[in-house]
Amino acid sequence: MTLEELNRTSPFHAGAENTAFAPYFDGTSYLNMLSTEQVPVGCVTFAPGCRNHWHIHRAARGGGQILLVTAGRGWYQEWGEAP
């Protein structure tokens, strides 16, 4: 699916090229901030072949990050569980 098709058919538009966080990705990603108010919500779109580096999201309370995958496949690691 092209970016144009994604932006036309999905409620989760790709947004602008994610240059601010580019050091954490191999390849091109796009960021569309859906909310910046009380709970920041961002939609990150990975171009074909893009991946991000293993990392952790910590939070003082609640969850550090919640992932909602809309297409494709990926890997994640749960704390305390075998990879």
Where are these regions (language model features)?
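A short beta-strand-loop-beta hairpin characteristic of the jelly-roll/cupin
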Residues: 51-83
